[in-house]
Design a protein with these regions (language model features):
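Basic, Lys/Arg-enriched alpha-helical interface segments
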Residues: 1-71, 81-83, 91-119
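Short, surface-exposed beta-strand/loop micro-motifs that present aromatic residues
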Residues: 74-77
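ATP-dependent carboxylate-activation loops
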Residues: 87
Length: 119
Protein backbone atom coordinates (compact mmCIF):
# COMPACT_ATOMS: atom_id res chain seq x y z
CA UNK A 1 0.00 0.00 0.00
CA UNK A 2 1.27 3.45 -0.91
CA UNK A 3 1.10 6.64 1.13
CA UNK A 4 -0.22 9.95 -0.14
CA UNK A 5 1.12 13.29 1.07
CA UNK A 6 0.01 16.81 0.24
CA UNK A 7 2.54 19.35 -1.01
CA UNK A 8 2.92 22.29 1.36
CA UNK A 9 4.63 25.50 0.25
CA UNK A 10 6.92 27.62 2.44
CA UNK A 11 3.92 29.70 3.59
CA UNK A 12 2.06 26.59 4.77
CA UNK A 13 -0.47 26.40 1.94
CA UNK A 14 -1.51 22.97 0.68
CA UNK A 15 -3.28 23.59 -2.66
CA UNK A 16 -4.76 20.12 -3.17
CA UNK A 17 -5.79 19.65 0.46
CA UNK A 18 -7.37 23.12 0.49
CA UNK A 19 -9.29 22.28 -2.69
CA UNK A 20 -10.62 19.08 -1.10
CA UNK A 21 -11.63 21.01 2.02
CA UNK A 22 -13.38 23.57 -0.18
CA UNK A 23 -15.36 20.75 -1.81
CA UNK A 24 -16.21 19.34 1.65
CA UNK A 25 -17.67 22.66 2.72
CA UNK A 26 -19.72 22.96 -0.47
CA UNK A 27 -23.39 22.17 -0.09
CA UNK A 28 -24.20 21.43 -3.71
CA UNK A 29 -24.46 18.11 -5.50
CA UNK A 30 -21.54 18.85 -7.87
CA UNK A 31 -19.17 19.39 -4.94
CA UNK A 32 -20.22 16.09 -3.35
CA UNK A 33 -19.80 14.20 -6.63
CA UNK A 34 -16.35 15.70 -7.25
CA UNK A 35 -15.26 15.05 -3.67
CA UNK A 36 -16.37 11.40 -3.76
CA UNK A 37 -14.68 10.82 -7.11
CA UNK A 38 -11.42 12.42 -5.92
CA UNK A 39 -11.48 10.28 -2.76
CA UNK A 40 -12.12 7.13 -4.84
CA UNK A 41 -9.20 7.92 -7.14
CA UNK A 42 -6.93 8.68 -4.19
CA UNK A 43 -7.82 5.28 -2.70
CA UNK A 44 -6.96 3.62 -6.01
CA UNK A 45 -3.62 5.46 -6.03
CA UNK A 46 -2.98 4.27 -2.45
CA UNK A 47 -3.73 0.66 -3.37
CA UNK A 48 -2.27 0.29 -6.85
CA UNK A 49 0.07 3.24 -7.30
CA UNK A 50 0.87 4.28 -10.83
CA UNK A 51 0.15 0.72 -11.98
CA UNK A 52 -3.55 1.59 -11.79
CA UNK A 53 -3.09 3.05 -15.28
CA UNK A 54 -5.67 4.90 -17.31
CA UNK A 55 -8.34 6.12 -16.78
CA UNK A 56 -7.17 6.64 -13.18
CA UNK A 57 -3.60 7.89 -13.59
CA UNK A 58 -1.51 8.98 -16.53
CA UNK A 59 2.20 9.76 -16.83
CA UNK A 60 2.78 13.25 -18.23
CA UNK A 61 6.53 13.84 -18.26
CA UNK A 62 9.60 13.35 -16.10
CA UNK A 63 8.39 12.61 -12.58
CA UNK A 64 4.96 14.22 -13.04
CA UNK A 65 1.75 12.16 -13.22
CA UNK A 66 -1.90 13.12 -13.17
CA UNK A 67 -4.79 11.70 -11.18
CA UNK A 68 -7.87 11.96 -13.41
CA UNK A 69 -11.20 12.09 -11.55
CA UNK A 70 -13.88 13.47 -13.88
CA UNK A 71 -12.62 16.76 -15.36
CA UNK A 72 -10.46 17.48 -12.32
CA UNK A 73 -6.76 16.86 -12.62
CA UNK A 74 -4.44 16.46 -9.66
CA UNK A 75 -0.79 16.51 -10.62
CA UNK A 76 1.48 14.43 -8.41
CA UNK A 77 4.98 13.00 -8.23
CA UNK A 78 6.49 9.81 -6.90
CA UNK A 79 8.05 10.60 -3.53
CA UNK A 80 10.18 8.76 -0.98
CA UNK A 81 9.51 5.20 0.25
CA UNK A 82 6.72 4.27 -2.15
CA UNK A 83 4.67 7.37 -1.55
CA UNK A 84 3.19 10.12 -3.67
CA UNK A 85 3.05 13.87 -3.21
CA UNK A 86 -0.06 15.65 -4.52
CA UNK A 87 1.26 18.93 -5.92
CA UNK A 88 -1.46 20.95 -7.62
CA UNK A 89 -4.91 20.70 -9.20
CA UNK A 90 -6.92 22.23 -12.02
CA UNK A 91 -10.08 21.58 -14.01
CA UNK A 92 -9.29 20.30 -17.47
CA UNK A 93 -10.96 22.28 -20.24
CA UNK A 94 -8.99 21.17 -23.29
CA UNK A 95 -8.04 17.85 -24.82
CA UNK A 96 -4.38 18.17 -23.84
CA UNK A 97 -3.00 18.96 -20.40
CA UNK A 98 -1.82 22.59 -20.50
CA UNK A 99 1.97 22.93 -20.50
CA UNK A 100 1.79 25.69 -17.86
CA UNK A 101 0.13 23.26 -15.43
CA UNK A 102 2.88 20.68 -15.97
CA UNK A 103 5.53 23.40 -15.51
CA UNK A 104 3.82 24.55 -12.32
CA UNK A 105 3.90 21.00 -10.94
CA UNK A 106 7.60 20.72 -11.83
CA UNK A 107 8.32 24.02 -10.03
CA UNK A 108 6.47 22.86 -6.92
CA UNK A 109 8.30 19.53 -6.97
CA UNK A 110 11.67 21.29 -7.37
CA UNK A 111 10.74 23.56 -4.45
CA UNK A 112 9.87 20.53 -2.33
CA UNK A 113 13.16 18.81 -3.17
CA UNK A 114 15.13 21.95 -2.37
CA UNK A 115 13.39 22.54 0.96
CA UNK A 116 13.65 18.88 2.01
CA UNK A 117 17.40 18.89 1.20
CA UNK A 118 17.86 21.87 3.53
CA UNK A 119 16.53 19.93 6.52
Amino acid sequence: MYQIHFYQDAAGHQPVKEYIQELQSGNNKDSRIKLNKIRDYMRILELKGTRAGEPFVKHLEDNIWELRPLRDRILFAVWINESFILLTHFVKKTQKTPKREIEKAKRLYADLLERSAEK
